[in-house]
Structure formats: structure tokens, C-alpha cells
Amino acid sequence: MSMNIGATAMSRSSQAYAVETCVPDAYHFSKAQSTGTRFIMMLTAVASGVFAGRVMHSTMSVEMALTGLFVVLAFVGGLLSTWSPCGYSSLSLLRPAGRYSLGAVTRWAPTFFTHAVGYAIGAVVLGGALGGISWLLFADVPLQYAVIGLATLAIGYGLHQFGFLKMPYPQRRAQVPHDARFRFRSSVIGLLYGFSLGMNYLTYVQTPMLYIVTGVALLSGGVKAGIAVIAVFNIGRCLPVAVNFLPVKDQSVQAWLARWQESAVEVDGFLLLAIASAALMLVML
């Protein structure tokens, strides 16, 4: 009887500890801009893209310009994925244990390393699969057709982000449980988290830039190119966790993310429209 009581007490204590150390979900975010403001931002994005496309067309090769535009879109798309439910929780779960100190950060460094390894594995698996499909089915698609198709899709999702068009948003509405840190060592959690997020479609999709990146990988022409495409996006997804090397409180990071939630969506839409417009100018001039 006493052993049962003791086990119950230990279980309750563990649950209480988990509740105390887990950061609650954020429900109050910054407000969206008015319809008029979003419309002006949309027009500005298109005009900026058209201007940038004309400038790049006269100063560099089309292939180099398109590569640069893609790298910007993919890397920033990875950064913007931090505003997903999994982005919030990864910054919270993958933190140094105890009070901030050089020793705590040093002991935590392997967790960041395994987290990055998980993202790398995800890029190899997802990018390799998409690149393989591209090699088999889409290797002969003309560059101009590919760019026009992906740019049109990007414009649609840019309008979606500004609230002027409804686009399909396929995703798996799942994330790693908040109590994950109590099941495995921190470095193991870092690896599992990195792989799950590095696969990109196993959890929530925060930015439709991922769909454009996926399309680029599908039209990349080979396995190596497909891996490189997803790797650029995953680098952007992985880097925000490095904020935990700094002496910042978890609550401060979560509050900052919540405060800029709507702005992240607007940046997302702006870049989709601007980069798509620039890409169209490059292949149509």
C-alpha cells in the first residue's frame, strides 16, 4: 500500500514538474493590417519584383539571377517556419538545462549539433526523393515553363498570405508533444526534432514557400540538386535554435515570436509576390 502511495506521489510530482517547466501555448498575437494596407503592400511587392527582375536581367545571366532569387526565397522561408507551432516548441524544448552559464551552453552544444544533423538527414531523404522523381519524370521540362509555372503558383500563395485569394494548404496538423524532453536525452530530442522538421511535411506547414521549394526540387533534374534545394530551406529552419546560445529567457523569445506573428505572414506574402514577379520578368524579357 505504501509503495503504491509513493509511486503515485512520484508520478504527480513528475507531472507537476512537467507543467511548471513547459511554456504554455501563445494565443494572443499581433493584429493583421487593414485590407487597404495589405493591398498597398501587395502592389508594392509586385512593382518591386518587376523592377528587380529588369535590373537583374541587364546585369547577370538568367540562370544566376534565378538561383539567387531561389536561395533568398528558400532560406527566408526556412526562417519564417519558426512561426509554426513546432517552431515555437523547438525553441522552448531545445534549451540548455538550468541557469544560463558557459558550462550549461557547452553541455547543450551537442543538442544543437544533433538537431542540425537531423535537418541534414531530412534534406537528404526528402530532397533525394524529390530529386529522384525529377530525374525520372521531369528532367526535360524547359526552364521557362518551369519558372512560369512555379512563379504563377507563388503569386497565388502570395495573394493567399495577404488574404485576397484562398489556396489549398496541404499539411499534417501534428507536432512533437510538449513533454518530449522527459522521454529522451536532450541530444536525442534534438536529433528527432531536427529530422521531423527537416522532412517538412511531417508537421505543420507555416509558410507556403515550402510548396514552391518542393516544386523547385521536383523540377531540379537530379538527386543532388534536389537535396541541395531542400538543404537551403532546412538551414533557414535550423538556425533560429542557435538563439539558445545567447542569455535570453524562453518567455522573452516566445513573446517576441507572438508579437511578430502577423508580420511574418506579411513578409511571407511580400516575398512570394516580389520574387515571383522578378522571376517572370527574367524569363519573359
Curated annotation (Swiss-Prot):
Transmembrane helix found in the keyword field: yes
Q: Name one GO cellular component term.
A: plasma membrane
Principal location: membrane
Tell me which UniProt keywords the record has, alphabetically.
Cell membrane, Membrane, Transmembrane, Transmembrane helix
Q: Where in the cell is it found?
A: Cell membrane
Record keyword Transmembrane present? yes
Q: In which pathway does it act?
A: One-carbon metabolism; methylamine degradation
Question: Topology versus the membrane, per the UniProt entry?
Answer: Multi-pass membrane protein
Q: Which residues cross the membrane?
A: 39-59, 60-80, 119-139, 145-165, 188-208, 212-232, 265-285
List the protein's name: Methylamine utilization protein MauF
Organism, scientific name: Methylophilus methylotrophus (Bacterium W3A1)
